Regions:
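Short, charged juxtamembrane terminal tails flanking transmembrane helices
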Residues: 160-168
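Membrane-interfacial alpha-helical segments at the cytosolic side of multi-pass membrane proteins
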Residues: 77-94, 140-156
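"…centered on the first transmembrane helix and the immediately adjacent amphipathic helix/loop
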Residues: 2-87
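Internal alpha-helical transmembrane segments of multi-pass membrane proteins
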Residues: 95-112
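Alpha-helical transmembrane segments of multi-pass membrane proteins
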Residues: 22-27, 111-118
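Alpha-helical hydrophobic membrane-insertion segments
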Residues: 4-18, 102-105, 147, 151-159
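Interfacial helix-loop-helix junctions of multi-pass membrane proteins
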Residues: 115-143
Length: 168
């Protein structure tokens, strides 16, 4: 690999890593905010979605259901994005298959620790509490992110193999 290509890969890895650190910081910051702030933020988002999706005012049951759905999906989606991004970094850093496998295992351990840790430390924040269900949602998000990355990589590999066989 030429020096220019190595430098390009280094820049991509650096950019991806910086984006992931900003994402992790935001995730932890949102996760560890006080209960009242978290409730206000979620309520504001629920009201905006309710106004945009429905023409009439939402009743208490609809607001509660939408609030629960948003909080559940937030756990799941945020950790899916985190896992997908960290898998991308692992595949850029490790070139050989054994190294990539190590990178994926390391990714799973780091993401699972973040998934459980963000929930665990909520019990030390005013107005927040630990819920094992939320920790499991986070971990399911990590698994879905990993699976999504592997499927995307498999599709990319198949397209690349097909295009190289057609060019011969």
């Amino acid at each position: 690999m030429s020096n220019a290509k190595k430098f390009g890969v280094f820049l991509v890895v650096l950019l991806c890593a910086a984006c992931m650190f900003v994402f992790i910081y935001t995730l932890v910051k949102l996760s560890l905010q006080e209960g009242e702030s978290s409730s206000r933020l979620t309520q504001a988002v629920v009201n905006q979605i309710g106004e945009a999706a429905f023409d009439e005012e939402l009743d208490a049951n609809q607001i509660h259901a939408l609030n629960l759905f948003l909080r559940t999906m937030a756990h799941f989606v945020l950790f899916s994005i985190l896992s997908f991004g960290m898998c991308t970094i692992a595949f850029l850093v490790f070139a050989h298959p054994a190294g990539r496998f190590f990178g994926l295992v390391l990714n799973m351990l780091i993401c699972a620790a973040l998934a459980y840790g963000t929930e665990y430390f909520k019990q030390f924040v005013d107005g927040r509490h630990f819920q094992i269900e939320d920790a499991w949602l986070n971990i399911y998000g990590v698994i879905i992110g990993l699976c999504s990355f592997l499927i995307a990589d498999l599709i990319f590999w198949a397209i690349r193999a097909r295009s190289s066989s057609q060019s011969e």
